[in-house]
Amino acid sequence: MAAAPRAGRRRGQPLLALLLLLLAPLPPGAPPGADAYFPEERWSPESPLQAPRVLIALLARNAAHALPTTLGALERLRHPRERTALWVATDHNMDNTSTVLREWLVAVKSLYHSVEWRPAEEPRSYPDEEGPKHWSDSRYEHVMKLRQAALKSARDMWADYILFVDADNLILNPDTLSLLIAENKTVVAPMLDSRAAYSNFWCGMTSQGYYKRTPAYIPIRKRDRRGCFAVPMVHSTFLIDLRKAASRNLAFYPPHPDYTWSFDDIIVFAFSCKQAEVQMYVCNKEEYGFLPVPLRAHSTLQDEAESFMHVQLEVMVKHPPAEPSRFISAPTKTPDKMGFDEVFMINLRRRQDRRERMLRALQAQEIECRLVEAVDGKAMNTSQVEALGIQMLPGYRDPYHGRPLTKGELGCFLSHYNIWKEVVDRGLQKSLVFEDDLRFEIFFKRRLMNLMRDVEREGLDWDLIYVGRKRMQVEHPEKAVPRVRNLVEADYSYWTLAYVISLQGARKLLAAEPLSKMLPVDEFLPVMFDKHPVSEYKAHFSLRNLHAFSVEPLLIYPTHYTGDDGYVSDTETSVVWNNEHVKTDWDRAKSQKMREQQALSREAKNSDVLQSPLDSAARDEL
């Protein structure tokens, strides 16, 4: 009889375990309804909302040069393509814009929700325009009508948003669309960068609707202030939230009945926003992309293509290159040497990133170069230095830190020295030398070729022409060269970023036997054209007759200056030339040599130099 209670307890244990299991809390992440005992009580969770419907509107005219890269950037936007519609219009083309767009649309049509294609092959120009870059009234009106048609299409298809993108605007941040949507603004633009102060927004507007300079602009443009800012104007690339009730009152055409300002598409739309009480915003929280500085009305299609190519070069200075669309055939490039006998590009083997960027930059400009492996001074030991017969110039000290020559500076000198030897050995009449840490100015190739033609036409006796440098004599202007545009007689200068050297000039530099009395190469050159301020250095070189000139304005600048993110020096952050134990890394943060060119007084500016038409091809920065 005593065993019966124990058997009952054993029978009750499974029931107790089942009850505890039913009452136990659900594990983290279990779906709602999973705790239901009966099947009919179980239910599935609600699915997330679908991505918003977006229409991307692209208007293109004479944009064949830009479209492969612009469209490649649009392809990489992180937004579901099945929730994205394309609205594309092109007309009045003098190039093959229609062909490029058609090739792309045929390839991507099945990837997107829908495609609306509005091509017009004729006419090729407007009757009242002076050239392809001139904005006449009829062109403004036509563009306004096209934007209005795109807006109507977006409304008709019940799109949540419409994103307007100019054909030469590069949206490189793939999250741009989602970031703008998250701002929850009726009209919002991503701030696009350019080579100058220009961007796709205004901070001020006059009572007549024109641009007004304000103190607020530059801090936003430079991202000293970050955020989303209320502004009177955004243009080129911007997003409209069509879910907002006020968006129904926005229009590009016809202009508002009360509109009396200039007949300009961006001003007309800004006025429409103002009348609808819709505030425009520009966001600079992230880096979103780039756009070119507008060209003047007299500019050509070649100017425009080279201007956009320069945007791509600027992208590569601090970002990965902007890759073109894989759906568009790449045009064939035919690099040349720009009329030089040789184009040298110096690069340290361990600086692969610089090499790749420079080779891509030169290829983009169709410049053929010979890659020269730089002498790595840091890898040289004292025995190797002595075997070359190298001795430092007696008494030399760095002008900023009082240190002797570094191994990095030694390697830099030998790299240039070896090129001078090759110039002489091969009998090269004129050569162009690049270092690998430089950025190109707009129209670089054409401007330098024009300069060299002027030099040859005038029969100028020259040995070396700086293409990029840091001007050290800033007290008075340099002497302009008569009848040669963009050229001055060089005074004391730093840097050997890029220069042109003649056979005669290379012979003069080698004849000075500089290895036996070495100093940094950018100190040696001013000694040789007798402009160095330290007479003790010059005394060691009896023949100082190098004929040196400089391009003005410069066509080459450094990619980075002291203090910039990414600044690296292979010459100043090194060790002393004859002692591996004496380091000079203190210069990394304090280097004065690689600081940006100091501002010149009005009296010291080279204002007498003859200017080229290409110097003023771009409009005012703002």
UniProtKB/Swiss-Prot annotation:
Coiled coil: none
Domain of life (superkingdom): Eukaryota
Family: Belongs to the glycosyltransferase 25 family.
Coarse class of the protein's main subcellular location: endoplasmic reticulum
Disordered: annotated segments: 588-622
This protein's name: Procollagen galactosyltransferase 1
Enzyme class: transferase
Organism: Homo sapiens (Human)
Disease annotated for this entry: Brain small vessel disease 3: An autosomal recessive form of brain small vessel disease, a cerebrovascular disorder with variable manifestations reflecting the location and severity of the vascular defect. BSVD3 patients may have disease onset in utero or early infancy with subsequent global developmental delay, spasticity, and porencephaly on brain imaging. Other patients may have normal or mildly delayed development with sudden onset of intracranial hemorrhage causing acute neurologic deterioration.
Motif (Endoplasmic reticulum retention motif): 619-622
The enzyme's E.C. designation: 2.4.1.50
A molecular function (GO) term: procollagen galactosyltransferase activity
Signal peptide: 1-29
